[in-house]
Amino acid sequence: ANLIRWEELTDIVLVGHSYGGCVISGVADRMSEKIAALVYLDAFVLENGQSLHDALPAEHRQGQLEAAAALGDGWRVPPIPAAVFNVNAADRAWVDDQCTDQPLASFQQKLHLDHSAAAVGSIHYIYAADWEATPFTGFYESAKARGWSTREIACGHDIMLDRPEELTAALLQAAAG
């Protein structure tokens, strides 16, 4: 949010991938007048007062807590292997090498919204439709029910790696309004 203020940015298209959906929701809630569009890219869409852990299935939440306790000194969650996200085989080793632990607190912190994000010009949801363990189906269905612009792309969670051309077209469409 500070970058938007400091650089005096306007007509922004904010894109949030995965956990980044939580971030763009918070930014949009605080400065919707600066944002032309939100794009949730196979992402979490939290409600006011909800944490990421609240939105996850119990088995995912428990797995993160156990991983943090066993491998993350109790405060960080090790990355999930790229294969789980159905990242294309050619990029899996690279993705695994780039990923880092995530603070457990980021999963537990509640998002506080006053719903001014509703003033954003357009909201889009792009769903990666080709990975079995996806926790995003419900968010995609909710986006459709809310009347948001939606699109399915048949690939794993890292759309930007698996289908960059389709993603570029979708983002340009969102930016065009």
Predicted features and spans:
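Conserved loop-alpha-helix segment in the C-terminal half of the alpha/beta-hydrolase fold
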Residues: 128-161, 166, 174
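Flexible "cap/lid" loop of the alpha/beta hydrolase fold
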Residues: 29-35, 39-81, 106-107, 111-112, ...
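C-terminal alpha-helix
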Residues: 3, 170-177
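Active-site nucleophile elbow and catalytic-triad environment of alpha/beta-hydrolase enzymes
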Residues: 97-116, 129-131
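Short, hydrophobic alpha-helix immediately C-terminal to the catalytic nucleophile
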Residues: 25-29, 168
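Conserved acidic catalytic loop of the alpha/beta-hydrolase fold
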Residues: 1-12
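Gly/Ala-rich beta-loop-alpha elbow adjacent to hydrolase catalytic centers
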Residues: 15-16, 20, 24
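Short beta-strand/loop motif that positions the catalytic acidic residue
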Residues: 119, 125-127
